[in-house]
Each structure stands twice: as C-alpha cells, then as structure tokens.
C-alpha cells in the first residue's frame, strides 16, 4: 500500500516575502537529471528573495548554495543538470529594481569548488518552462506568450522557432524524450522516409548534432535518431465565447515546429479547478465538483476522450495536484498531503503538516528491497516549504496497484507489513490469559542458562529413533514438570510457568519430523502429546523446520497426522508463512471446514497483498480459485455464515486478494463465477445503501445523548403539536418538537426515569418515520 513516512527538516530557508503578482512564482524546485535520468537524491530549490540551493536528500543536508540579490524573483521552475562533478542550473530571474527578465545559469564543481553565475539576455520576456535536450546539449525555452525558442550551446544565442495560439494561456509544458511517444515517432519516421520533411532548420541541426553532444550524455543510439522523435507537449486553455477550451500542442524538437494540435473533450459542465497532463502526454487529469476525470488519447479522433470518473471526498478544497507516478496523484488540501490511487479511486494515506505547505518537487526511484518485479515499489521524498523551513516527507508506492491494496486497512508506516510477527506471537487469534509471549520466552531463555537438559535430550532422541511415542510423551512431560518446579521462583518474574528454553524446544521439534524418499515432510515420531504441547504454548518454530529443505507444506503434514494439531499450528505459530496459510485455505475449501477457513482467512489478512497473492498462486489451481471465490462471496453476502470474531473487512480484503490472483479472465472463465460476482455486487451495493441510511440516524442519536439530562431537569408545560411530522430545520429543535408532539397527560403520574425513557423512544420513532418519508 502507499504510505507516507515521517517529516524531517533540511534547512531554515522559508517564504518570508509574499508575491501576489501574476506570472511570478514565489518558490519552486526540481530534480537533477544525471545522464538524462532523474537523480533519486539531488534536488534544486529556488526561493524568492533568498536564492538557489541544492540539497542531497539521502544525507539530508545542504549541498551547495547560490545567494542572489534580495529583490530577485523567478518566472519558472529551474532545470538542474548533473554531469559528473559539474552541476548546471538554469532559471529565469529578474530584479525588482529594473524588472528585466534574463536567463540565469549557475554552474559549479563540487570537487574543485568552482562556481560561476552567468546571465543571458532574452529581450525581457518571461519564461514559462525550460527543457534540456541531453542528446544535443540544447535548451528549449517556452515563453509565457506561447513562443518556443532554442538556446544553442555553440553560438550561445536564442533562436525563435514556433508559437502556439496567441490567445492561449499556458498551463503545463512536458518534454518527452525519444521513443517515449510511439504515435508521433511513427509519424515523424514516415515523413522522413517519404522525404516530406524539407525543413532547413532540421538539416542544419542534424549536421551539427555530433559536435554538441556532451561527453557525459552517452546513449546507445545516434543523436540523429534521438532528436527525430523527441517532443515537447504544451497544455493550454483558450477562451472562446465565454467557454474555456483545452488543447495539447505537439512540438517536434527535430523539425522545430508544431506538428499537431489535440483537443481535450471535457464532459464537465463547469471548467475544472485543476488540470494536469501525464508524463508521456497520453492522459489528461481534471478535478472538478463532479470528481476526478481521466481522459485518454484517442487515436481515431486525435483528441482526449473521457474514460472514467473517480469520486473523492473534499474534492473542492484541493489547492495543488502533482502526478507522482502512473497510478498515484499527490494532492494538497489545506495543511494535508494525500496520496490518491487513480486505479481504483481510493485515498491511500493522508499526512497532516499542521500548516499550509508549498510543494516544491519530489524524487522517485525504484526500491531495491525486493528483487521480484511484481513486489517492487517506488520510493522517494517530497520537498515542501513550510514556515519553519524546508522539509522532506518520504513516501512509498506500489508500482502496480492491486485491488487488495485499495481495500486493505493500513496498520503501519513505511517499511512494515500490515501484520508483524510480534503481534501474531502475542496470540491475536486465540490468546490465552496465561500464555507466554515471544518476548517472555526470549527473556527466560537468556536469564535461565540450564545445561542439565542435555542428558534428557539424549534419552529423548533414543526414544524417537525407537518410535516409542508413549514413553517419549511421558518423558517429555516429566522433563517439563521438573523444569518448572526447579525454576519456580524465577518463573514468578515472568508470570508464567509454561516456558522451556527455546533451543531445547527446537531440538525436540527436530526429533519429531523427518524427510521421506520424495523429500516431503513427515511425522517420524508420532508423539502427539509433545507436539501438541509445543504448538499450544507457542514453542513450535516454523523457521527451524524449514531449514530441513523439504518440499510440500507443514500444514498438510500435520493435517494428515492430526487435524486438531494442524488447526493449533495455524493459529498459534508466530512465524508461519503465507504459503502455509494458503494450503490451509485450500484444505478448508476441499473439506468444507468453515472454522478452519475463518482462521486461515484471518491470518492471511495480516500479510500484505503481494505476499498473499503470490502464496495463493503457488498453492492453488484455477478450480480451487473458483471454489474459493464463491465461498468468500457467500461469506460476504450471508451474514449468518460470517464469524462474530472477524469483521466484514477481513473477508472483503481476502476476496480482493483472490480477485487480484484470478484476474479478469479467471473470473469470466465460467458462468458460475459471473453469477457469483453479480450476486456479490448487488449485495455490496445494498449494504452501502443501508450504511448511508444508518448514517442519517447518527445526528438524532447524538441529540438524544446531548439533551437527555436537560429533558429530565426541565419542568415546563407541554402542548400538543398539530403537525407531528413537520420538517425540522434545526436539529436542536428536535427534542422540543417531540415533547410538544406527545400529550403531556401521559407523562403525569410517572417517574422521572419513565418519562425520560418515553421521550427517548419517541425521538427514535420520529427519526425512523422521517427516514421513511
């Protein structure tokens, strides 16, 4: 699941002076491009009246600083290029004294500590965005008036190339490198093959491409091919007859001209409050009162068409929006940051900063904690500017959003699973009052260093080899009793008398199991009393048993041996794997054991969605998935089948894991699955309707609690109300209306408690009648 980490401050830089002028940004930031790839650690921050600073996110420190005059202001976000030890930062600045806008280049060497600031004249035009072409070393300049120009590194001059609609208001500019947009790449390639491209500017630029490629910008393809497919996309709005229309223009870097214009066909009645373009320009996201609308590029109509609308809470209070990945939006509303899942439409996590922030930039890189692609996550830092200073908030996102992640309940922060072994070791399912915890076991194992059990272990080993199970159980229980009596005083410290040293318990466990000819686990010594004691007192270690390197499942082995022991193993073993739980679910489905299924589902809900899904895929076949899907659907639909110990959320989470594992094709593979899905959908929709109706009763119930004492204390004359079902606008008048509605004669002669009870019943009855109306 997606989640935030804990905030930490980098420096005391902050927004002191407020800028309310149009086309001026008070503060902004960007991520360094290292050989054309976004760096996960280096960011650049510019703050009005204070200067430009570079920070290292991993070390959480200031890396370099470029102080500027006090009255310096900015018109665009900076662009940050890192080539070895050299750092290059471009931005558009102006002094408030003369008001002339220029391009600022700050370059420094972190090894030799060299630094230089250079200004370039741009005829006093404000810049909207800057883009760096790594293959040619050129800088693409997008001015606020819609003009597009190039800053050539050879002659160090600005060359105008194209311009968008004169009445356009630029909203976003996005640079997409080569091969990132196949639609425009194929079109440009066909033009070059047919010889329709006769632009002299392109020929001139391609001829000089090789000499302008930076040494650090090494690529595996030629610069000519790279520049032929690189595009700059401009999202802008145009006012036509009091109607705002949105368009996306495609600017070819190689041809240096606008190649096409695509319209955004909005479905909203009113103009959206926020509009955003994806990084590859194939999607448009708009936020309005109707919800979050997602538009996708339609090839035939050459426009952006609506594909779905997602509804979120507090959608009218949004102040800032950023596309943090392909599946998540970073939203700021008031002082809160939130991660919105745009796959299923859920708010994954919310972080309250206690004060309104300014989002500067964010880093994003693939986590290397897990090797498998489906387990990989995106992690990074969000840089925000607060009154106290510059701060960063870490976050983590799943690369592929699963349904189970959308419906799962978060119980922990970054770096932790939904359930931990410590919680399971405490016995969250079948915890006994006198049962020991893993902490108590470890504490006693450290405090009580006993070597007298070695002789007992040797004798038990000989009994196990002889398969004398009766004497083995008697011998083991005798050892336990003598051990408890010997250390009775020490056990008072731990408040338990049922603990053995953990190494001794693990040694006993290894005597009970062995491998057969097919390398499968089997109970070689059927000492059920000993095995039951180890499992019930949580001394059984699954991790120790796994070291034998067997194939198959421990649960299946115990289930064949004795069903009660297998059930206790499922509930009381702290380090059990998700695969063992999946095997238990499969056994419960095939044998129709409802109690076993409930316990297995409860244990499965403690794992993260990816681990649970992989365990099910490893243990199940398609026929087993069909049976499990129908069974879980019945548990969700029929409340009589569900256990009182586990809430409905557990079943819904496990059902979502099953749906992720089956996929759309698996659900649609049979008519029975489709019928079960239809019944499940109708039932969940009915439950949501009932919950909505119940939520309307809450104000009336709170009114009862708030006014009950006041009603008892009041002694006034009551009169009958001629309109008992009149609509009450103010909830505070509800109790007064009901007191007038019911005849005061019925209250005469009754006790104070009886009168209060009658009023409570009347209020509840009135509430039900109003809901029916």
UniProtKB/Swiss-Prot annotation:
Residues 192-219 are annotated as: Disordered. It holds the Pfam family Utp8_C. The keyword Endoplasmic reticulum does not apply. GO terms for cellular component: cytoplasm; small-subunit processome; t-UTP complex. Its main location: cytoplasm. Disulfide bonds: none annotated. This is Uncharacterized protein C1565.05.
């Amino acid at each position: 699941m997606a989640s935030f980490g804990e905030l930490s401050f980098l420096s005391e830089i902050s927004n002191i002076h407020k800028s309310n002028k149009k086309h001026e940004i008070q503060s902004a930031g960007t991520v360094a491009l290292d050989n054309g790839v976004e760096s996960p650690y280096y960011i650049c921050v510019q703050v009005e009246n204070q200067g430009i600073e570079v920070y290292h996110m991993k070390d959480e420190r200031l890396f370099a600083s470029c102080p500027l005059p006090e009255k310096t202001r900015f018109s665009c976000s900076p662009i940050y290029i890192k080539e070895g030890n050299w750092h290059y930062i471009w931005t558009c600045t102006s002094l408030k004294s003369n008001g002339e806008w220029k391009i600022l280049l700050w370059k420094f060497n972190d090894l030799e500590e060299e630094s230089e600031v250079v200004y370039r004249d741009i005829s006093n035009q404000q810049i909207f965005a800057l883009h760096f072409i790594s293959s040619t070393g050129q800088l693409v300049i997008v001015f606020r008036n819609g003009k597009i120009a190039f800053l050539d590194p050879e002659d160090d001059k600005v060359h105008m190339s194209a311009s968008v609609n004169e009445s356009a208001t630029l909203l976003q500019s996005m640079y997409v490198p080569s091969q990132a947009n196949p639609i425009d790449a194929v079109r440009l390639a066909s033009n070059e093959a047919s010889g329709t491209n006769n632009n002299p500017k392109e020929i001139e630029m391609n001829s000089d491409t090789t000499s302008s490629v930076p040494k650090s910008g090494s690529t595996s393809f030629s610069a000519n091919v790279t520049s032929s497919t690189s595009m700059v996309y401009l999202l802008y709005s145009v006012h036509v007859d009091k109607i705002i229309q949105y368009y996306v223009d495609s600017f070819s870097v190689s041809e240096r001209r606008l190649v096409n214009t695509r319209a955004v066909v909005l479905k909203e009645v009113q103009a959206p409050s926020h509009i955003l373009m994806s990084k590859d320009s194939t999607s448009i996201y708009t936020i309005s009162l109707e919800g979050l609308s997602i538009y996708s590029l339609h090839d035939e109509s050459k426009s952006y068409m609506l594909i779905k609308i997602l509804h979120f809470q507090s959608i009218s209070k949004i102040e800032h929006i950023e596309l943090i990945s392909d599946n998540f939006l970073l939203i700021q509303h008031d002082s809160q940051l939130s991660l919105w899942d745009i796959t299923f439409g859920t708010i994954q996590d919310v972080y309250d900063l206690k004060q309104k922030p300014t989002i500067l930039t964010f880093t994003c890189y693939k986590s290397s904690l897990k090797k498998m692609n489906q387990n990989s996550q995106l992690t990074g830092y969000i840089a925000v500017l607060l009154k106290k200073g510059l701060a960063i908030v870490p976050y983590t996102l799943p690369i592929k959003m699963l349904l189970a992640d959308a419906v799962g309940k978060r119980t922990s922060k970054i770096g932790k699973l939904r359930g931990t072994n410590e919680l399971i070791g405490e016995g969250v399912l079948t915890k006994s009052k006198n049962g020991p915890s893993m902490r108590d076991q470890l504490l006693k194992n450290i405090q009580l260093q006993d070597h007298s059990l070695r002789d007992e272990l040797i004798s038990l080993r000989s009994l196990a080899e002889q398969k004398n199970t009766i004497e083995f159980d008697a011998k083991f229980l005798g050892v336990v009793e003598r051990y408890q009596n010997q250390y009775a005083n020490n056990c008072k410290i731990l408040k338990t008398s049922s603990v053995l040293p953990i190494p001794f318990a693990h040694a006993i466990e290894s005597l009970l199991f062995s491998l057969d000819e097919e390398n499968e686990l089997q109970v070689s010594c059927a000492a059920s009393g000993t095995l039951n004691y180890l499992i019930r007192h949580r001394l059984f270690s699954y991790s120790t048993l796994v070291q034998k390197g067997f194939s198959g499942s421990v649960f299946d082995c115990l289930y064949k041996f004795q069903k009660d022991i297998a059930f206790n193993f499922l509930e009381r073993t702290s380090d059990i794997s998700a695969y063992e739980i999946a095997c238990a679910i499969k056994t419960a489905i095939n044998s129709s054991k409802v109690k076993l299924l409930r316990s297995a589902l409860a244990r499965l809900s403690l794992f993260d969605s990816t681990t649970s899904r992989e365990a099910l895929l490893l243990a199940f076949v398609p026929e087993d998935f069909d049976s499990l899907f129908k069974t879980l659907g019945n548990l969700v639909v029929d409340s009589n089948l569900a256990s009182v110990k586990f809430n409905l959320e557990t079943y819904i989470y496990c059902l979502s894991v099953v749906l992720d594992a089956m996929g759309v094709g698996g659900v649609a593979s049979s008519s029975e699955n489709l019928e079960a899905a239809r019944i499940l959908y109708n039932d969940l929709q009915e439950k949501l309707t009932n919950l909505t109706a119940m939520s309307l009763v809450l104000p009336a119930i709170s009114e009862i609690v708030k006014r009950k004492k006041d009603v008892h204390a009041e002694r006034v004359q009551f009169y009958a109300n001629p309109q008992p079902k009149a609509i009450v606008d103010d909830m505070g008048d509800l109790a007064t209306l009901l007191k007038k509605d019911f005849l005061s004669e019925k209250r005469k002669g009754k006790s104070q408690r009886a009168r209060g009870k009658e009023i409570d019943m009347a209020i509840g009855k009135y509430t039900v009648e109003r809901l029916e109306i």
